[in-house]
Amino acid sequence: SVSLLGTIVKYLALTMLVPLIVAVVYGDDIWVFGASLMIALVAGIAFERLDPEPDIGPTEALLLVSLAWFGAAAVGAVPYLVAGYGTESTIGLDPSSTGALLGSVINALFESMSGFTTTGATVLGSISVEDHSHAIMLWRQLTQWLGGMGIIVLMIAILPELAVNGAELMQSEAPGPELQKLTPRI
């Protein structure tokens, strides 16, 4: 399952091309996304080559989904770390201290995981292009969009396996005595 995690990391790295293009257009943070893209791409390819023919069963699939969330957060944190956003000034430590480095890693992981889980919490302070580059702001929004799409894909993949259709799900979640189906009319 490590090689499949590498594939996920590799494709997630390719999504950094979008903010890289924005960085080139606006002329800011080009090296941030260039370096982040290369770091994530190399890591993804390296993980992919560890097991060229993965044997995946239900246990490995569960492990892969869990590792994919953490892998996505780690990859998503790289641009924040490279750019230095949400770092020592946010947590009030001396930039040269070990705690500042740990704090910046934690803040970057928090910002990334917040995006991929679509919670919207942030350590960036004010969220505007006056305070942060266009590319970083796009990356923040892109992680939230990817997280939202991930939940939708997960539900589309899992609900049929549980033999639950949309009407049954809605009936179980809707308040009231009974849910009536709509009848299509032409």
Each PLM stretch: what is its role?
Residues S1-I186:
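Membrane-proximal intracellular helices of multi-pass ion channels
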